[in-house]
Curated annotation (Swiss-Prot):
Active site: 135 (proton donor/acceptor), 139 (proton donor)
UniProt keywords, alphabetically: Amino-acid biosynthesis, Cytoplasm, Diaminopimelate biosynthesis, Lysine biosynthesis, NAD, NADP, Oxidoreductase
GO biological process, one term: lysine biosynthetic process via diaminopimelate
Subcellular location: Cytoplasm
The protein's name in its UniProt record: 4-hydroxy-tetrahydrodipicolinate reductase
GO MF term list: 4-hydroxy-tetrahydrodipicolinate reductase; NAD binding; NADP binding; oxidoreductase activity, acting on CH or CH2 groups, NAD or NADP as acceptor
Binding site for (S)-2,3,4,5-tetrahydrodipicolinate: 136, 145-146
Length: 240
């Protein structure tokens, strides 16, 4: 499988290493600032890389969004987070002519976490819910795309909920329709997500801990291996 990388930061450098270990080939890179140290051919547009079978994106909206406006039919695996509503809208339009896979978190374990959450929320309807995520000190967006995804799952299952991002100005007691959302940044934390269900005299916490960023790179490669055999459409872990 010939792979075009969109973005060449820490994550796509891991994708390159792991993909080559699996026998795939990196045939090009698109990055905001071309670098002489990049060991692959560098392009400005997706359509310029004729040899690619698929593109894997770990970048940001500033780089990705203009590329999505171009004319091409290359399958895309998208891991960019930020500006989610706009991103989904653009990807759904694009998916009418080419296969597109999107996940805010490329870990299959996080996908399993969402499935567990779909079962837990109805069972624990009287419990308050608080969401917490922790990442390294270089992550610029907060809350994480994964935490937003977890909140969206809860929103589909509980009526009239609202997110609360900061309680220091609140002077009234917590209501049941609030979902607390908390972000921690520090050190080299790869990624931690906790869902706290707090009831009367008992709590339940469901957690996911990423121990290496390799899980995200391998998840993207695995998605690409399947996506290149798919018809045009919008794919997630639920239907790939």
């Amino acid at each position: 499988m010939n792979i075009l990388l969109i973005g060449y930061g820490a994550m796509n450098q891991k994708v390159a290493r792991l993909a080559e270990d699996k026998g795939h080939e990196i045939v090009g890179v698109i990055d905001r600032t071309p670098k002489s140290s990049t060991p692959y051919s560098q392009y400005k547009h997706i359509s310029e890389c004729k040899e690619a079978d698929v593109a894997i994106d770990f970048s940001n909206p500033e780089l990705l969004f203009p590329l999505l406006e171009e004319q091409f039919n290359l399958p895309l695996v998208i891991a960019t987070t930020g500006e989610k509503e706009t991103l989904i809208q653009k990807l759904e339009t694009l998916s009418q002519r080419t296969p597109v896979f999107f996940s805010a978190n490329m870990s299959y374990g996080v996908h399993a976490l969402t499935k567990i959450l779909e079962t837990a929320v109805p069972l624990l309807e009287d419990f308050d819910i608080e969401l917490t995520e922790a990442h390294h000190n270089k992550k610029v967006d907060a809350p994480s795309g994964t935490l937003v995804k977890l909140y969206d799952v809860i929103k589909e299952l509980r009526d009239n909920i609202s997110p609360v991002y900061d309680r220091h100005e609140k002077t009234e007691k917590r209501t049941h329709d609030e979902i607390g959302i908390h972000a921690v940044r520090g050190g080299t934390i790869v990624g931690e997500h906790d869902i706290l269900f707090a009831g009367t005299d008992e709590t339940i916490t469901i957690s996911h801990r990423a121990q290496s960023k390799d899980i995200f790179a391998n998840g993207a490669i695995g998605a690409a291996e399947k996506l290149i055999h798919k018809n045009p459409g919008f794919y997630t872990f639920n239907n790939l």
